[in-house]
A protein has these predicted regions:
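Ser/Thr/Pro/Gly-rich low-complexity linker/stalk segments immediately outside membranes or between
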Residues: 27-41
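Surface-exposed amphipathic alpha-helical segments
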Residues: 49, 53-54, 153-231
Length: 231
């Protein structure tokens, strides 16, 4: 694999896959105060505590990913927490950044650095015209991606909140983050993940193909590769 064009094609295909996955999962939110109840969770790769009454969602895992993803919802406050543990999983957020996702904030909780990304989305099934009335703001989904990289493995919590039930300005100082996301991330206890699936396998790539694409994405992000000069 010696053509940079191959990398661009692979990234373009991956972007479509990522967008599709995001569209499937981006349909829930939360909002509660610190006096509400809390809910403990414990899965194959991490454990911790949510603020509020949260239930586990059923996931139809297939193949090597089975047990390495998890999902929870706070139905009272419209919130979804999607979790995953994948080797080289930071490749996904790197590609997100190529698509325009802003650089992450970095926070240290219990000795572990977390990268915190923020973005927004609008569910297509709820909006027919993005230029319509002032109620449109209620359709905006606030998305926080919290990622901890440990020995080449990404532990990721994707939090989605909609209907503006909890104030959010996209920072780490708004009620949405301070009351719900921050406390959750701070509570996380990691588990050994030597058998976590590899991103290469999930994308249907050989190790060589994945390394080529990852190196290429890394090069664009760190400025050593100029994609505009691709021939």
């Amino acid at each position: 694999m010696d053509s940079k064009k191959t990398a661009i094609i692979a990234i373009a295909v991956l972007a479509i896959v990522i967008s599709s996955l995001g569209a499937v999962s981006a349909f829930e939110l939360f909002g509660m105060n610190l006096f509400d109840s809390s809910t403990d969770f414990d899965n194959k790769f991490m454990s911790g505590t949510f603020n509020g009454e949260v239930i586990q969602n059923e996931i139809k895992d297939n193949g090597s990913i089975k047990g390495w993803t998890d999902s929870y919802s706070d139905n009272e406050n419209n919130i979804t927490y999607n979790m995953s543990c994948v080797k080289d999983g930071d490749f996904i957020t790197d590609v997100y950044q190529l698509q325009g996702l802003g650089a992450p904030e970095v926070r240290n909780y219990n000795g572990q650095a977390w990268k915190i990304f923020y973005s927004q989305a609008v569910p297509d099934n709820n909006v027919t015209d993005n230029k319509t009335s002032g109620n449109d703001t209620n359709n905006t989904i606030n998305v926080y991606i919290c990622e901890a990289d440990i020995n080449g493995t990404a532990y990721t919590i994707n939090v989605m909140s909609y209907e503006n039930k909890t104030e959010c300005d996209g920072t780490l100082f708004c009620p949405l983050y301070k009351e719900y996301i921050g406390p959750l991330v701070e509570s996380i206890q990691f588990k050994e993940a030597k058998k976590a699936p590899k991103m290469a396998d999930l994308l249907g790539m050989s190790d060589e193909e994945f390394k080529f694409n990852k190196d290429y994405v890394d090069g664009i992000l760190n400025g050593t590769i100029d994609p505009s000069k691709l021939q």
